[in-house]
Every structure is written in structure tokens, then in C-alpha cells.
Amino acid sequence: MFRTITSRLAFSVRQAEETVKPRIAYAQRSGRRIKEKVALMQAKRKEAGETGAPEKPGKFVLKTGKGTRDYGPAQSALRNSVLQTVTETFNRYGAETIDTPVFELRDVLMGKYGEEGGKLVYDLQDQGGELLSLRYDLTVPFARYLAMNKITNITRYQIAKVYRRDQPVMSRGRYREFYQCDFDIAGQYDLMLPEAECLGIVDELLTKLEIGEFFINLNHRLILEGMFAVSGIPAKDFKTICSSVDKLDKTPWEDVEQEMINEKFLTKEQTGKLGELVRFRELNSDLNNLELLEKMSQLPDLGQNDKFKKGAEELKVLIEYLNVDGVTTVRYEPSLARGLDYYTGAIYEAVAPKALEGTAVENSEDTAGQPVGVGSVAAGGRYDGLVKMFDSKANVPCCGVSFGIERLFAIMEARQKVAIRTTQTEVYVASAQKNLVRDRKKLVKMLRSAGIKTEMALKANPKLLTQFQYAEERRIPLAIVIGEQELKDGVVKLRNVVTRDEQTIKLDQLITAVRDTLAAL
């Protein structure tokens, strides 16, 4: 009886609560909160690669993974030409090549890229064995290779793909899977000679690739540490403040200063002093590199700082070597502050801010609505302590440079004015009549055996006009035409595909004639 009364009472209370609903109090911020939640949901969907309305259950969207792309014949041909130029340049500087696994032990990569870089490493799913991650760059695997094989002296290059969980912007060559081309010098050498080699390669290679105007920013870790010290910034805050300073190439000083004050708790006095130093190039744009370093050395506090003095003297030696080499694209930039999780000396970065001027993507925007730019196309520096992270007894000083080949490719693709050939075919063998497929094949075999790149139509009786059109579309320089009468006379017609001029050549002189004609083109 008691239980029945209690149940009825509880039901009456619930009914009353549902009938008389409490008045909703709307906060002024509720609308903003809803917008923030919607924006967050949209950001998560974008991160997951979703676009538009959600797909129906079970429907498969055929596409490449976010931050990756396919390369068709034209793009592959252009990229291969870039890689060939890179390889030839590296070989000219006496480098050997190595290859390392696409994935490394997770412990090899962790702790080498700082807090932000570490978040971008792709971890592989644990299969009950070793914990593995995809390589983030080629430098740390190279240091692991040196330590593991007890190598103390090598000049090496490596061209391979790396992987980063970055926010991709395809139109400016920013991907999650991309090629890096690294050149490094490991070993005990005299001051700044390896750095001069690395910067010489950057200058030579970017000039050859014709990406437009570029310059190479140059700084030194010790100079940065000296500037921070005289600004009253504790050594423990070095890396976190450097991450703010490094934004000066894209962000006004006022915004960077507010970030350091509001988020990193520097005082106005500290940021004021630091701002004068890191913007020294901007405030003294009429001075050359040596003059700029000399003027900074004359500042009362900075000129007496031991770290600054050592870094400045080393850069002066490097700049003098570059002057001897005729490298004029290097620019001393006190605000350059990248890669400081393992760089110990000189640091440098090549940028091409006007590379996309006059191209179709010049005024385009990325997915976040920001203007599309290319960013750095090469970067590097000295990293004397990286090998020691793997072997405490190893003392292998290193310096090097890494080229972002996808960014260079994006520039060249945007600037490309002439269609690039997708094959290397030199000769196309055509027939003017039917039933000559065997004779065409004999000619193709003869030419290929002589080392001449040759094609023919893979049809028994192709039309002559169709064969000529194919050769013209593929920009094959020469065509060899055979007919019944030519075969009886032991001759062929050698045709210039561009000019359409033809000459009759004896069959036993064909190889020599083809080689001479190709050499004259």
C-alpha cells in the first residue's frame, strides 16, 4: 500500500514538472557559444577530409588521402626533370647517396622535433611488436645511420619521401606526403667551409631551376641566444620565444609582440629591447651583411655578449667565403629562428616570395581563406649534437640543407609556359601502306638495339595521318616512314616531325643518319 502511494506521488510530481517548464535564461554569450561549437564541428569535419553533405551509409568516395596527390605523366615528367637537376648538382659536389627505411623506431624520432613537430609525426598502429613511426624528415634518420654504423666522415645526399600530419595547402606545395632532397656534410672540418658548400649548392640549384627571384636568409643560434640574453629573457624561454620571433616573416611586429606579452608573459621592456634587435635588418635595410653585423657588434650590451661575438665572427668568416664563391643571394636576417631543437650554429633558409607572380595561383587562397604563398623552398644549418643523442660517445659535427622538392615543383608547375614532353622517345617508325607491321618491328628492333629510343603504333594497319599526329602530339623529333617501294629499294624516309622536311636514307646508313640528325636538333 505504501509503495503504491509513493509511486503515484512520484508520477504526479513528474507530470507537474513537465507541465510547468522552467523559464529558460538566455545568456548574452549563448549565441557566440553556439557559433563556436559549429565552427569547431566544421573544423573537425575539414580535418577528417569531409566536404559538403555527409555521404550515404556504405557509399565509398574514390579519392586520394588528405594531403596526397597523384602525378600524371606531365607532372611526373616535370618532377623527374627537377630531381635530375638536383641529383646532378649533388654529384658535382662529391656527395654519395644512401637510403634509409620509410619508418623508424618511435624512440628514434621522439624528442627531436620539439613540441609542435612531435605532434606531426605519423605513428603506425601497434601490431604487437616494435613501436614504429613514419619518418618526419631525412636528417634524424641520417644521424641514426651515422651513430649505428660508427661513421665519422661522409658527404651524403638522399632523395626520399617523408610524412607529416600537417594541414596541407596543395597549391603551394604543402602536403602530408612529400619528397625531401637532403645534402649533408658530416665530419671534422675547418670553420664554416662546410656551410659555404651547402649555401653554394642552394644558390646554384635554385638558379638552375629558374624559380624567379630568391634569397637565402642567414642567422646563427649563438647570435639569437646573445640577443635574448641582453633583452633579459631567461634561457629556459629561448625556444618558446623563438617560435614567436620566427613569425615575423608573415606577421607584423605589433602582433608578435602582443603574443609574447599576453601568452608568453614577457614584459614590455623585454619585448621592446628584443624587437630592436630582431628587426635590425628591417630598420637598417641600406646596410650589407658585413656592415649589419659590424653595426650590431657596436651596440653597448650586445657587442659585449660572448655568445653574440662568437656567432657574429663565425658568420663573418662564412660571408667572406660566399663572396669568394660569388654567392650574392645570401642575406643576414637576425629574425630567422627555425629548427632550433637541434641546430647548434649557423641556420639558413631560402625563400622565393615572388615566385608565383604572374601565375594563375598568384591571387588564390588556401582552404582557410589565406593568400597562397610558397614559404621556404630550402632550409638547413649546423647540428653538431644530433648524433650524440643516439651515441653519447660519438662526436660527429654535421651541417646540411634540405630542399622542399614539392614546393619547388609547385612553383615550376605554376610558372610553366611550354608543355613538357612526357616521354623521351626520339624516333617514331611509321608505315605508309598496309601489311608492313613486321617490317616496322624489324626497324624498331634495330634502332632500339643501337640505343635509340623508338616507338611504333601497336596496330597492324594504322593510318599514316594518325601516326604523324601521334608523333606531333608527343613531340617526338623524328619519324621514319617505310612503304613497299622503299623496302624494295633498301631505303627509308627520315622525317623531321616539326618542320615536316623529309630525306631519303639508305637502310645501312640509317643509324648514323638518325644520330647525326638528333645531335643537330
Swiss-Prot record:
PROSITE patterns xrefs: AA_TRNA_LIGASE_II (PS50862)
Organism (species): Caenorhabditis elegans
Reactions accelerated catalytically: tRNA(His) + L-histidine + ATP = L-histidyl-tRNA(His) + AMP + diphosphate + H(+)
E.C. numbers: 6.1.1.21
Keywords: Aminoacyl-tRNA synthetase, ATP-binding, Ligase, Nucleotide-binding, Protein biosynthesis
Pfam family, one: HGTP_anticodon
Disruption of the gene: reported phenotype: RNAi-mediated knockdown results in gonadal defects including smaller, narrower gonads and reduced fertility with either no oocytes or no fertilized eggs in the majority of animals. RNAi-mediated knockdown results in an increase in the expression of gpdh-1 independent of hypertonic stress.
SUPFAM superfamilies reported in the protein's UniProt record: Class II aaRS ABD-related, Class II aaRS and biotin synthetases
Protein name: Histidine--tRNA ligase
Binding annotation for L-histidine: D137, L138, T139, R164, Q180, D184, R338, Y342, Y343
GO molecular function terms attached to this record: ATP binding; histidine-tRNA ligase activity; identical protein binding; RNA binding
Membership in a protein family: Belongs to the class-II aminoacyl-tRNA synthetase family.
